From Swiss-Prot:
HAMAP family: FBPase_class1 (MF_01855)
Record-given protein name: Fructose-1,6-bisphosphatase, chloroplastic
Gene designation: FBP
The protein's Enzyme Commission number: 3.1.3.11
Induction info: Light activation through pH changes, Mg(2+) levels and also by light-modulated reduction of essential disulfide groups via the ferredoxin-thioredoxin f system.
Listed pathway(s): Carbohydrate biosynthesis; Calvin cycle
Species this chain originates from: Pisum sativum (Garden pea)
Residues given in the record as Mg(2+) 2 binding sites: 155, 176, 178
Family the entry assigns: Belongs to the FBPase class 1 family.
UniProt subcellular location: Plastid, Chloroplast stroma
Span of the transit peptide along the chain: 1-50
Amino acid sequence: MAAATASSQLIFSKPYSPSRLCPFQLCVFDAKSVLSSSRRKHVNGSGVRCMAVKEATSETKKRSGYEIITLTSWLLQQEQKGIIDAELTIVLSSISMACKQIASLVQRANISNLTGTQGAVNIQGEDQKKLDVISNEVFSNCLRSSGRTGIIASEEEDVAVAVEESYSGNYIVVFDPLDGSSNLDAAVSTGSIFGIYSPNDECLPDFGDDSDDNTLGTEEQRCIVNVCQPGSNLLAAGYCMYSSSVAFVLTIGKGVFVFTLDPLYGEFVLTQENLQIPKSGEIYSFNEGNYKLWDENLKKYIDDLKEPGPSGKPYSARYIGSLVGDFHRTLLYGGIYGYPRDKKSKNGKLRLLYECAPMSFIVEQAGGKGSDGHQRVLDIQPTEIHQRVPLYIGSTEEVEKVEKYLA
C-alpha cells in the first residue's frame, strides 16, 4: 500500500478480489474505513471508489519525466545528426554485441569452467587464459558478421587479419578482447578495449579463389602499415568494463558517453553524457612492486606524492592491475594512472595501438591527457601492431606534473 493523498487514501495496484473488480481500474480505499473495518475482514463499500487505470497512468507519465536512451537509439541519433555514418553505426553495434556476450562469459566463468590458462602463449609471450581465446573469437566473429569491417588487429593475433571478401567492409578495428584477464580467477574487474580507424580501399587485399588463408602475408604489408596509424586518426574508441555493473564507455570524437548494461532488458542504457575528468586529483595508480626497476626521476615523483600536499594530505594509492578498471576510476575521480618503462620492460608494457591510443583518445575527449612521459600518445606513429610504450594518463595537471619530473 502507498499513500495517495494527504487525506490518508490508499491505492492498491492489485485488487483483493479480481473477480469483482475490473482489471482496468485502480481502487482507492479510504484509510479510516479500511482500518475500522479490518476486524470484520472486509472493506465497507463506502470506503471504496474506483477510477480508470488509463487516467492514473497518464498522470504518472506527466509527473515522471523519465526517458531511457539505449546505445542503439543514441547511435541512430548521431547518425541523423551527420556525426557518424550508417556503416560506423553497424560496426559499433556489433562491438556492443560482442561486449554483451563477453560480459555473460565473464560472469559465468567459474560455473562454466572457463578460468585458468589455455595452455598456449600469445605473440606477447604471455600465457593465454581460456577466456582470452574465447573473447577474441567472439569479438572477431561479431566484427566479421557486421559486413562493415575490412581489417582487424587484436592482442591475441600475431598480425592483422583481413575479413573474408564476401563479408568485407572498410573500417579498421583494433582491440584487446579481454584486458586484465590475469585477474579473472579472482573475480576482479576486467574489460575490452577498442579503436576504430577510417576505411581505406587500397588496404583491402584481393583474395584469389584458391586462397583459404585470410591472414595478411608479406605481399599485403601495405595493409599492416595502414593499420599502424597514430591515435590522432581514430574515429571512435571505447572500452567495456565487466565489474559489479557492465559499463560501455564510448567516444566518437564529440565527448565521452557512458552506457550501463541493464540486465533486465539486455540493453546498454545511457547513464552519463559528456563526462569530464577533474583537472587534478589525489589518487595515483602505479604498480609499486616495480619501484626498484624505475629510474630515479620517477622514484622521486612517487616519493613526493606520498608527502602531504597543499591539502595537508598525501596522495592515495589505488591499483587494481586491470587497465580498464584503473582507468575507469581515474576518469571518474581524477588523478593519474601510470605504467612506466623500467629495467625489465625498456619500452613499457602496454600496447600502443589497441590499449594506449584508444584510452588516450577517450581521456582527451574528457578533458584529460595521455602521455608517454615526453610526448602526446596520440601523436606517436606505430611501427608495428604490438608496439609497446610507457603510459601516463589521467587529469591534465597530474600528467603534466609527471612530465616535468621525467624531462
